Amino acid sequence: ETMITDRSADSLSSGGDNDIVIEILKAGWSVGYFPELSLVHIIPQERLQISYFARLIKDTNKSWVQVLEKHQINPWHKISSWTVPLRKAKSWFKIAAWKNKINYLNWKAACGYYEGLSK
């Protein structure tokens, strides 16, 4: 039995799509990538803000690690939860998150991985 993980409440986690694909593969089916297909996605203005992208990337990375863990295909070692704030602080400086928006988003992505890997 599996529980598909996806967005709920204020969380922007989006592991549901990946979870579905992994379940399809485990059931013996095939999946495909078709670059000639296109999709028009109408996005509200508030979702084009750095603050939204920061939450989205953090929650997406956290849920991705959790989906991999659930399916026992996570290539990374779990980390102690008490180390997460220290790792985030170290990454803030290593990535220089204060310098520009891209660095800040990269830092938020790292934060999501740490949260997903914590026990």
Walk through the language-model features, giving the residues of each.
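Short regulatory "switch" loops immediately downstream of catalytic or recognition motifs
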Residues: E1-T5, E69-H71
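Acidic donor-binding loop at a coil-to-helix junction in glycosyltransferase catalytic cores
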Residues: M3-I20
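Short, flexible active-site loops
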Residues: M3-S8, S38-E46
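C-terminal catalytic/acceptor-binding lobe
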Residues: D19, I42, E46-K70, T83
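Hydrophobic residues within well-ordered alpha-helices
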Residues: I24-L25
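Catalytic beta-strand/loop signature of glycosyltransferases that borders the donor
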Residues: G28-I43, F53
